[in-house]
Amino acid sequence: MHVPVLLEEAADALNIRADGIYVDATFGRGGHSRLILSRLGESGRLIAFDKDPAAISAARSIRDERFQAVHGSYAQIRTALESLSVSRIDGILLDLGVSSIQLDEASRGFSFRHDGPLDMRMDSSRGKTAAEWLATVTETELKEVIRTYGEERYAGQIAGAIVMAQTRQPIVTTFQLAEIVAAVVRKFGHRDGRQHPATRTFQAIRIHLNQELEELSVTLPQCVELLNANGRLVVISFHSLEDRIVKRFMRMQAGTDTLPRKLPVRDEESRMHSRQTLQIIGKKIRPGENEVAANPRARSAVMRVAEKLETGSKVDR
């Protein structure tokens, strides 16, 4: 069962208007969507996105004229909304990462805790599986992926072990990969007992395969463009790589962060960063002790909120 993280907090952060138009960019199993719908009036509207065909299938169970589900990535949100004749929205929620159901379903291949085919695709209807990618990736590229997206100190040793194992037998299951990685980590160092040795490597491969950080980076500017004045951007992230992108973007748009000196930027980027388009609302929010006790996977969640300003104002540098 998928338990939505920061459920009430996210809905509160959207500051929902009864007649507003809202987007749940990651439907999952609809926990956030259902609460948003409960707070909308008869003329309100909610549009949900998800790359996962199983999530879209679950969305069909919502029989509500105010609700519409779109199978696709939130990276194409502007184009998708245009096709629905929606040019502006009053709020958008991005609940990033992989869902509990995806982790717990062995056939999806996301988790080292359940043996299954090494898949890891958010959209199981397209693209390479993790097994297919591992069969062709070079040791150098694999090391870079694990180091960059997993922040794994033993990236080089793990990449070498995976490539070596691949020459002996194709790596096609989650347990195969987990055992290879765990053996390396246990050999070269110690890891927090609460975290499985393969956690960072699985995260890295999943992020790379699904282009999660690239999609987030191209989505955030679209969100700002689509928001009406006083509309809210609410983002829940689950690891430092995501949160760093969200934090930096919001600070840039709020005029509280500057471009690094000597960084080459296009004129349009310089103009964008010189105008204040967002106001950051409050501090980052984390799940409380009770929520973490009931749902341990919520422990790493961080929610950030920003509001679209009436007009972009000049920021003095």
Curated annotation (Swiss-Prot):
One Pfam family hit: Methyltransf_5
EC class (word): transferase
GO cellular component: cytoplasm
GO molecular function per UniProt: rRNA (cytosine-N4-)-methyltransferase activity
Keywords: Cytoplasm, Methyltransferase, rRNA processing, S-adenosyl-L-methionine, Transferase
Residues where S-adenosyl-L-methionine binds: G30, G31, H32, D50, Y74, D95, Q102
Main location: cytoplasm
GO terms under biological process: rRNA base methylation
Taxonomy, superkingdom: Bacteria
Location of this chain's protein in the cell: Cytoplasm
Signal peptide start and end residues: none
Record's catalysed reaction(s): cytidine(1402) in 16S rRNA + S-adenosyl-L-methionine = N(4)-methylcytidine(1402) in 16S rRNA + S-adenosyl-L-homocysteine + H(+)
EC number(s) reported in the record: 2.1.1.199
Function: Specifically methylates the N4 position of cytidine in position 1402 (C1402) of 16S rRNA.
Family listed: Belongs to the methyltransferase superfamily. RsmH family.
This protein's name: Ribosomal RNA small subunit methyltransferase H
Organism the protein comes from: Nitrosomonas europaea (strain ATCC 19718 / CIP 103999 / KCTC 2705 / NBRC 14298)
